[in-house]
A protein has these predicted regions:
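Loop-to-transmembrane alpha-helix entry segments
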Residues: 65-66, 102, 115-138, 147-154, ...
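Glycine-/small-residue-enriched transmembrane alpha-helix faces in small-molecule transporters
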Residues: 1-40, 146-173
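C-terminal-most transmembrane helix of multi-pass membrane proteins
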Residues: 8, 42, 140-142, 213-215, ...
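Helix-helix packing/entry segments at the starts of transmembrane helices
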Residues: 40, 79, 83, 98-104, ...
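Transmembrane alpha-helices of multi-pass small-molecule transport proteins
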Residues: 29-81, 108-109, 162-170, 184-203, ...
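Specific transmembrane alpha-helical segments of multi-pass solute transporters/efflux pumps
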Residues: 21, 50-96, 102, 138, ...
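Hydrophobic/small/kink-forming positions within alpha-helical transmembrane segments
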Residues: 18, 22, 76-80, 84, ...
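Membrane-interface helix termini and inter-helical loops of multi-pass transporters
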Residues: 22-34, 60-61, 91, 140-152, ...
C-alpha cells in the first residue's frame, strides 16, 4: 500500500481540484468575478499556510535567496500567468475548447521531463497519455459541437497548458533542496502576492456582506487550493513528473460528476466514456 501512496496523493489532488467548480459557481452567482476568485485562492492560500506553518512547521519560512527563482516559476509563472492565459482563452473560445487545450499539459510535461530530467518516454506512458487526452476530450464536450475557436484563443489556450505544465517541471528543482511543505509555501508566497494586482476590493466587500460566502471562500481555499497543492507536490516528490501530470487528468472527470450531483447537470454518456478512459490510464500507470 505504501508503494501506491504517492499515486493516491496525486489522484486525491486531482479530485480536490475537480471540486473547484462547486465553490466557484456559488461565488460567481453571488457576484464574484473570476479575477477576485483567483485572489481568494492564491492569497487566501498564502494566509492559511502562513498561519498553519507558524504554529507547526516554521522551518518552511527559510529558503536560500538563490532558490527564489524556482518559486517565482511555481508561483507567478505556473499560478498567476497560467490563470490569466486560461481566462483569456475562455473569452475567445468555447469552454470545451479551452478545457481540452489546457489538458495538452500532460503531453508537454512528458516531453519537457524527457528533456530536463531524462525521464524515459515509454510505450506505457504514451498509451496512458493518449487515454488521458481522449478521456478529457469526452468529458469536456469537445465532440458535442461546442467547439468555437479563434487563432488567438488557441494560442492563449496552448499557453495556459504550457504554463500549467511548468509547475511539474519547476517543483522538482525545489524538491531537491526542500520538503514538499516548503515548496508549496513559497509557491503561494509568490502566487499569492502576485495575484493582488487582480483584486477588486469593492466587489469583494459586496459579496462577503453575505457571511455564507465567506464559508464558501474558506472551502475553496482549504479543499480546492491548499490541500491539492500539498498532496500533488508530496506525490511529485516520489513520482515522475510525466506520470504525475497524466494522473492529474482525473480532475475534469471529478468536475463533471460534481456538476451532475450538486447542480443537476445532465448525465452524459460522454462523461462515463471519459471516466473509463481515465481509469484505464491510471491502471496502465500503476
Amino acid at each position: 500500500m505504501k508503494k501506491y501512496l504517492p499515486y493516491l496523493n496525486i489522484l486525491g489532488a486531482a479530485a480536490c481540484w475537480g471540486c473547484i467548480g462547486l465553490f466557484n459557481r456559488f461565488l460567481m452567482r453571488a457576484g464574484m468575478g473570476a479575477a477576485n476568485i483567483v485572489v481568494i485562492r492564491n492569497f487566501g492560500g498564502l494566509v492559511l499556510l502562513t498561519l498553519i506553518f507558524a504554529l507547526r512547521e516554521r522551518s518552511v519560512f527559510h529558503v536560500k535567496a538563490k532558490h527564489l527563482p524556482i518559486f517565482f516559476g511555481t508561483g507567478v509563472v505556473s499560478m498567476v500567468f497560467f490563470t490569466l492565459c486560461y481566462f483569456k482563452c475562455q473569452e475567445l473560445c468555447s469552454l470545451a475548447v479551452s478545457a481540452i487545450l489546457l489538458y495538452t499539459a500532460p503531453a508537454m510535461v512528458v516531453l519537457m521531463s524527457a528533456a530536463v530530467f531524462r525521464e524515459r518516454i515509454t510505450r506505457k506512458k504514451l498509451l496512458a497519455l493518449a487515454l488521458a487526452l481522449l478521456g478529457c476530450s469526452f468529458v469536456t464536450g469537445v465532440w458535442s459541437g461546442d467547439a468555437s475557436v479563434t487563432a488567438v484563443g488557441v494560442l492563449f489556450g496552448l499557453g495556459a497548458g504550457f504554463l500549467y505544465a511548468l509547475y511539474s517541471i519547476f517543483a522538482p528543482f525545489g524538491l531537491r533542496h526542500y520538503t514538499p511543505f516548503t515548496v508549496v509555501y513559497w509557491t503561494f508566497v509568490f502566487g499569492g502576492l502576485g495575484s493582488l494586482f487582480l483584486l477588486d476590493a469593492g466587489e469583494m466587500r459586496t459579496v462577503f456582506a453575505d457571511g455564507r460566502m465567506i464559508l464558501v471562500a474558506l472551502g475553496l481555499i482549504v479543499i480546492s487550493t491548499v490541500l491539492p497543492y500539498l498532496l500533488y507536490t508530496n506525490g511529485l516528490a516520489r513520482v515522475e513528473s510525466g506520470k504525475a501530470s497524466i494522473l492529474a487528468s482525473l480532475e475534469p472527470v471529478v468536475a463533471s460528476f460534481v456538476g451532475i450531483l450538486a447542480f443537476g447537470e445532465p448525465v452524459s454518456l460522454m462523461v462515463f466514456l471519459g471516466l473509463g478512459c481515465i481509469l484505464t490510464c491510471v491502471y496502465v500507470l500503476r
